[in-house]
Amino acid sequence: MEQIIVHGGNTKLEGTVKIEGAKNAVLPILAATLLAEEGVTTLKNVPILSDVFTMNQVIKHLNVAIDFDEDANEVTIDATQPLGIEANYEYVSKMRASIVVMGPLLARNGHAKVAMPGGCAIGKRPIDLHLKGFQALGAKIIQKNGYIEAIADELIGNTIYLDFPSVGATQNIMMAAVRAKGTTIIENVAREPEIVDLANILNKMGANVIGAGTETMRIEGVDKLHAVEHSIVQDRIEAGTFMVAAAMTEGNVLIEEAISEHNRPLISKLTEMGAIIEEEENGIRVIGPKHLKPTDVKTMPHPGFPTDMQAQMTAIQMFAEGTSIVTETVFENRYQHLEEMRRMNADLKIDGNIAVINGGNELQGAAVEATDLRAAAALILVGLRANGITRVSNLKYLDRGYYEFHKKLQKLGANVERVNDEKIEEKQATTVI
């Protein structure tokens, strides 16, 4: 077991931090490379994350040659050989996003079999919208023994309305529809920047996708797609996490290559709290205030406030001088991190999907456990300002979405370290709290 140990109290982050390629963009784009029947695809700006390694293994076991050059942050994929139809259970069960291989496999093979996905324990997150989309394109769906199968002799374009703008469903249906005969119109689609990035690579590959980033997408089916070179868009959630870190520590941090247009709701909320946000030529600078003001947040599908920034916002709200209200509308069961923050003397109440955070308490370091990916980052952020030592465990979640998070914080001046069991025992024997 590993832990991140945070020595908090008077941390002020200063300097420059580099943002990686987006986890939420690279995973569906890796799946999209299965559609390339000609050539070798090269993906650049690929983040070194455990989820990326998992997706690489899912793809490899479909009879695809894949190589990850970690030094160059590049992945090459040769999917020109006949593909398998079944995604490997060992890897699919670890990560929910692996369900997005289903659309490309259905489009390419006319047959896809995928185990029910795993991942972070954030609510139910059903995949019924994915399956309804496949059915609308002419696929037969079979659910049996923990597996889902989609079978179609031919996919036919159709008009599909999503009851909710699900990111995963939008991606899966897009990738199936690019090979469907005729025109597919998808209404009430997800509009996240990662959707636009997926559409960009699909169009480079020879697809005809119109309207990505808007509420309605139109896709004209094509017969074949080919390999391309593509650079993954920057990670707006990692950028947002460091923006919050700077703001809550009275810091002064330049987040390199962060795209302000992708973080408008967060910028608005941090400004309300007193932070100064400056757009510079090579990124976004965040200067934290001496006194943080409270602010209310309601998560929404893009372009609303992102649910993936909710935990980090609760971290900064703990130190605001007043009461903040958070309303989570995207996922249920996404306040588990708040129970861990209570261990640090946080004053809060949870009522269904609403959390009331009374800021201004003196928070104390404690041993806490990450309950999901963003919770892991949020607990570390609270530790930066809490008095004493905070120990954050269950780092498998952190590694799914952040590359060397502790090292980036160290570079900005934080007193944090990542230690293994042996070093933990040594420190516990010598440290008085």
Curated annotation (Swiss-Prot):
Active site: 120
Keyword Cytoplasm attached: yes
Domain of life: Bacteria
List of residues binding UDP-N-acetyl-alpha-D-glucosamine: 96, 125-129, 308, 330
Pfam family, one: EPSP_synthase
GO molecular function: UDP-N-acetylglucosamine 1-carboxyvinyltransferase activity
GO terms under cellular component: cytoplasm
Gene3D superfamilies registered for this protein in UniProt: Enolpyruvate transferase domain (3.65.10.10)
Keywords linked to the UniProt accession: Cell cycle, Cell division, Cell shape, Cell wall biogenesis/degradation, Cytoplasm, Peptidoglycan synthesis, Pyruvate, Transferase
Keyword hit for Cytoplasm: yes
Positions where 2-(S-cysteinyl)pyruvic acid O-phosphothioketal occurs in the chain: 120
GO biological processes: cell division; cell wall organization; peptidoglycan biosynthetic process; regulation of cell shape; UDP-N-acetylgalactosamine biosynthetic process
UniProt main location, coarse: cytoplasm
Catalysed reaction, written as an equation: phosphoenolpyruvate + UDP-N-acetyl-alpha-D-glucosamine = UDP-N-acetyl-3-O-(1-carboxyvinyl)-alpha-D-glucosamine + phosphate
SUPFAM superfamilies in UniProt: EPT/RTPC-like
Chain residues that bind phosphoenolpyruvate: 23-24
Cellular localisation: Cytoplasm
Enzyme Commission no: 2.5.1.7
Annotated metabolic or biological route of this protein: Cell wall biogenesis; peptidoglycan biosynthesis
Function recorded in the entry: Cell wall formation. Adds enolpyruvyl to UDP-N-acetylglucosamine.
PANTHER family, per database record: UDP-N-ACETYLGLUCOSAMINE 1-CARBOXYVINYLTRANSFERASE
Family from the record: Belongs to the EPSP synthase family. MurA subfamily.
Name assigned to this protein: UDP-N-acetylglucosamine 1-carboxyvinyltransferase 2
Source organism: Enterococcus faecalis (strain ATCC 700802 / V583)
